[in-house]
Amino acid sequence: MSAIQAAWPSGTECIAKYNFHGTAEQDLPFCKGDVLTIVAVTKDPNWYKAKNKVGREGIIPANYVQKREGVKAGTKLSLMPWFHGKITREQAERLLYPPETGLFLVRESTNYPGDYTLCVSCDGKVEHYRIMYHASKLSIDEEVYFENLMQLVEHYTSDADGLCTRLIKPKVMEGTVAAQDEFYRSGWALNMKELKLLQTIGKGEFGDVMLGDYRGNKVAVKCIKNDATAQAFLAEASVMTQLRHSNLVQLLGVIVEEKGGLYIVTEYMAKGSLVDYLRSRGRSVLGGDCLLKFSLDVCEAMEYLEGNNFVHRDLAARNVLVSEDNVAKVSDFGLTKEASSTQDTGKLPVKWTAPEALREKKFSTKSDVWSFGILLWEIYSFGRVPYPRIPLKDVVPRVEKGYKMDAPDGCPPAVYEVMKNCWHLDAAMRPSFLQLREQLEHIKTHELHL
């Protein structure tokens, strides 16, 4: 007998596994893939009261839906779970034991640095095929060429095409989880057939951001084609499955293509980045109420991240987006990590990053607070670049000696005080986002922002 499942609380998001047409008037019909929110448990534990995305409520059968979960923190997602990196020929043969025809893995070549080796178990022994890397393409036979390892594996999975056998079963590297399986299990996998890509709205070094249509709704889609880059973006997507707040850009789902493409689908923010929004409108259009509202929107998102132990690490007006109805939402979770983790900082935006984060790679909610102070300065200067007229190389030495930017023209003194509090050199002296929100609400209530 199966254990009785604990009832899902109100607010739980579910994804439909099948179509449900409904038989009674109180039923809520839905299609496979729809996202539904639980409103309440009914007397019968097999049925829930739920609402769909347009707010219509009704009764749904529990066994037709699955609960959406965050991808577990610490799960090592991989687009290539069969890729084992630098292992020797002998280690590969041990991993493919006991022999099973079609069991395979890919490793880095030990004899030919820069190339790879496909190791396949076949009729009791292991065959090793060199994958040559030439002119940015991969090939085993120098006849068929592939853009990346995923395309190569997909090809030989459907057809042996000269190998001893077609690839049947990947030998998954210990500790990794196939990304597609995990997004599917946790209810975040979307169907490529239902996504229409309409036009490019942004270009990044990783690929394009496109306006799309998913089941009749406008969406933004990050299209990542390169397998190494896609691997890095998996971390961003899995962080986004754990976060839900009205001032964070909402993940709608992920599509992992067998050929190696990764599509991250989010809500569409019609008015673009906050920095462009501010620059294109300026003082004549945007009054004090509007600037303070944007400041509070961002602060509430950051208070939520603070409360859930996430550090954003790249907070700036360019990474805040504005919706059709003028709500500011924090986006770009590429560097967001659980608070305890450290990482190599690579190319950090010097003018937005706290001194201790630049110096010792110490990231915390308090370094996010420093960046929030810079973002407030951007808002009240209508999108100017911080530290105007100071050469980039001089910014850090001056800041470490205690230099703080002047208030932007026309900035209310009370708001400038909040900025300066964010720029304490001693991180412990900076306010929390909870305190910052309270300070901004005090300014709003007492109309100190006008």
From Swiss-Prot:
Taxonomic lineage is: Eukaryota, Metazoa, Chordata, Craniata, Vertebrata
For the region Interaction with PTPN22, give the residue spans. 9-70
Species in which this protein is naturally found: Homo sapiens (Human)
Q: How is it modified after translation?
A: Phosphorylated at Ser-364 by PKA, leading to increased activity. Autophosphorylated.
Recorded consequence of changing Y304F: Decreases activity by two-thirds and alters conformation
According to its UniProt record, which residues of this chain constitute the active site?
A: D314 (proton acceptor)
Q: Would you tell me the protein name for this molecule?
A: Tyrosine-protein kinase CSK
Tissue expression remark: Expressed in lung and macrophages.
PTM sites of type N-acetylserine: S2
Record remark on domains: The architecture of this protein is similar to that of Src-family kinases (SFKs) with one N-terminal SH3 domain, one SH2 domain, and a C-terminal kinase domain.
Summary of the function given for this chain in its UniProt record: Non-receptor tyrosine-protein kinase that plays an important role in the regulation of cell growth, differentiation, migration and immune response. Phosphorylates tyrosine residues located in the C-terminal tails of Src-family kinases (SFKs) including LCK, SRC, HCK, FYN, LYN, CSK or YES1. Upon tail phosphorylation, Src-family members engage in intramolecular interactions between the phosphotyrosine tail and the SH2 domain that result in an inactive conformation.
EC? Answer: 2.7.10.2
Give me the segments passing through the membrane. none
The gene designation is CSK
Keyword annotations for this protein, in alphabetical order, are: Acetylation, Adaptive immunity, ATP-binding, Cell membrane, Cytoplasm, Immunity, Kinase, Magnesium, Manganese, Membrane, Metal-binding, Nucleotide-binding, Phosphoprotein, SH2 domain, SH3 domain, Transferase, Tyrosine-protein kinase
Q: Which residues form the SH3 domain?
A: 9-70
- Where are the Phosphotyrosine residues found in this chain? Y184, Y304, Y416
Provide the residue positions that the database annotates as binding ATP: I201, G202, K203, G204, E205, F206, G207, D208, V209, K222
Q: Which InterPro entries match?
A: Csk-like_SH2, Kinase-like_dom_sf, Non-receptor_tyrosine_kinases, Prot_kinase_dom, Protein_kinase_ATP_BS, Ser-Thr/Tyr_kinase_cat_dom, SH2, SH2_dom_sf
Q: How does it assemble?
A: Homodimer (via SH3-domain). Interacts with PTPN22. Interacts with phosphorylated SIT1, PAG1, LIME1 and TGFB1I1; these interactions serve to recruit CSK to the membrane where it can phosphorylate and inhibit Src-family kinases. Interacts with SRCIN1. Interacts with RHOH. Interacts (via SH2 domain) with SCIMP; this interaction is dependent on phosphorylation of SCIMP 'Tyr-107'. Interacts (via SH2 domain) with PRAG1 (when phosphorylated at 'Tyr-391'); this interaction prevents translocation of CSK from the cytoplasm to the membrane leading to increased activity of CSK. Interacts with LRRK1.
A GO cellular component entry from the record: cytosol
Localization, UniProt:
Cytoplasm; Cell membrane
| Phosphoserine: modified positions | S364
Q: Could you list the residue ranges forming a coiled coil in this record?
A: none
Enumerate the spans annotated as Protein kinase domain. Answer: 195-449
Cofactor(s) demanded: Mg(2+); Mn(2+)
Class in the EC hierarchy, top level: transferase
